[in-house]
Amino acid sequence: FEVRNNRLDQVFFGILLERSSEGIVSGNIITSKAKSQSTSGNGVHIWKSEEITVKNNEVIGLRDGIYLEFVNNSEIINNLCKDNLRYGLHFMFSDHDLYKGNIFENNGAGVAVMYSKFIDMQDNQFRKNWGSASYGLLLKEINDSELKNNIFEDNTIAISADNTNRIDYIENEFRNNGYAIRIRGAVYDNNFKRNNFLYNSFDVAYTGRLNNNKFSNNYWSGYSGYDLNRDGIGDVPFRPVTLFSYLVNKTPEAIVLLRSTFIDLLDFSEKVSPIFTPADLIDAQPQMKKIQW
């Protein structure tokens, strides 16, 4: 079946699919002017379905732009989800899915992927998701997945990871975010490789003392090391977790000291002799130049 090239204005729910398979939702424009989450619905709402393709749609001004629950082997491609009250895209209990080439901009809390596995996230843009409880991408209890070639720009928190394991973060760009990556509890065996971290207030915030996540060959705009043999790799490891990010996690009011000379001295002392931050959370091969892919 196909739901194609429709315009739906001032709707509560836009398109609702239940117990469906082998369908295409394409080229639709769905808009509303939702004022509160309790009085609004979702643009594209899919429940207990499989092999659904949602592509080239615009969903603006609803509660969730696209919502999937118990939806497997499906694709979310080249959609624009903007100005939605809660999430631009909301995954729950959905496995073996791809979302690629989407733009998620100025949504209440960005994108949430929860209680899922084998999710492929490629070439998406997460932009301008600002707020005290906002982020570009929330990962909660998601395993065995990959994020590649995504851009995170101007978000309060670009990625918030909680109880996520065996995730590969490859060749993504984190630009001008409050936090680039905020790692909560029970986050293990993740691999961060060849990403660009550009001018974020905090590149990595980490709440625990134990770490077995790997950072390698990333570019960090805050790296001040040297490359004597000119192989493009810094000769001194980079520690992305600062003491100040640890203090802000413990005492949020400390954020008023951001970029003060006193904080710079604290961060330097923690790099020399780590006490509060994980000593083994380092990038041993930081890149000297921004990575192109």
Regions found by a protein language model. Name each.
Residues L8, E18, I30, E50, ...:
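Sequence signature of WD/YWTD-type beta-propeller architectures
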